Every structure is written in structure tokens, then in C-alpha cells.
Amino acid sequence: MLTLKRAKELAAPMVTEEHLILHELNVCYAMGAMARYFDENVEHWQAVGMLHDYDYEKYPEEHLDHTAEPLRAAGVDEEDIRAILSHGYGIRNDVEPVTNLEKSLYTVDELTGIIQACARMRPNGIQDLETKSFMKKFKDKKFAAKCNRELILSGCEMLGMELKDVAEICIEGMKEHAEEPQLTGTS
């Protein structure tokens, strides 16, 4: 089974830009929280989250086209590779998210971008971010405008969950690990 340590080792040579590393970490820790919600292996889901943008920095226009083979060669399970590929469903490929792992990654990828933007605006970072504040910012299409809200809502629907519930789970998971992805604020 893929460990977080191994995922970080695999990601290190491919993901070197700070903003992408921070994004990977945010997705990683939000995925851990989703795993806890679904009573799944937290570290495994974190590891998949850590690798979700494996080829993005080097191949942004061909994102996910250069993921499967190198990860397969590194011994990553097919189920994990499929989960990683599925977060590009409808945008980069036709690998539809089916499992809770896949649906969560599909949803959390964009969702964490808005959560991160909310946290960066606050003196205490994510530590005092409440779901209601996130929901207010989510409705403002100009805030974190590059985050695909339609995709997030589609993912929540796939999961059979309300946006506020998924956001709360992810915010709490990101709070637990706020220091590493630099979400602790300025105060």
C-alpha cells in the first residue's frame, strides 16, 4: 500500500514549485480527513492526494498524460493510479470517479484551493476559519476565481454529500496539519 512517505519521495523530483507543493499538501491532508469520514486508511488517502498532480508542473498542457506509466514503474497500485487519473474527469480524460477515494479526490482538489485562499486572508490562517465563512466566499465567484465551483458541486453530488459538510471535513483536516502547508496565518 502506498505510504505518505513514499508519495512524497515520488513527488519530490516532479513537484518543485512552492505553490504546487503547498497545493499537494492541502489536498493530501483534506483527503486524510475524507478517509477518516469514510472510515478508510487515512495515510493511504493522503498519499494519493499527495500524488494527484504528479505531472502538472512539467506537463501542464498534458496534465495526467504523463502520470500512469512512471507511477506504475515505481510500483504504485493500479487502484491508486486510477484514482489519480479520475480527478481529471471531464476536463483531461474520461476516467469517471467511482469509488469514494476517487470521488473525494475529484471534489477536494478544487475545494482546497478556495479553503487555502480563505485561510490566506485571515490573520490566524485556517485556525479560526469556519465553514460559514467558507460558504460565503464560495458564493463569490470572483474570490479564488480559478477554482471550478461547478466541479466541486458535481463532486459533492457524486459523494451524496452537501458542500458545507465536505468543506467542514476538509477544513478540519487541513487545520490539523496547518503548519506544513503554511496555513497558520501571520499573527
Region roles according to the model:
Residues 38-143, 153:
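Divalent metal-dependent catalytic cores for phosphoryl transfer on phosphate-bearing substrates
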Residues 2, 22-26, 62, 99, ...:
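Conserved active-site and cofactor/substrate-binding residues in soluble primary-metabolism enzymes
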Residues 131-132, 139-172, 181, 185:
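C-terminal binding/interaction regions
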Residues 1-59, 68:
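Acidic/His-rich, divalent-metal-binding segments that scaffold phosphate/diphosphate chemistry
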Residues 8, 12, 28, 32, ...:
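Predominant activation on well-ordered alpha-helical scaffold segments within soluble catalytic domains
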Residues 14-15, 31, 35-38, 74, ...:
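Structural signal for hydrophobic packing residues in well-ordered secondary-structure cores
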Residues 3-18, 29, 89, 95-96, ...:
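Metal-centered catalytic cores of metalloenzymes
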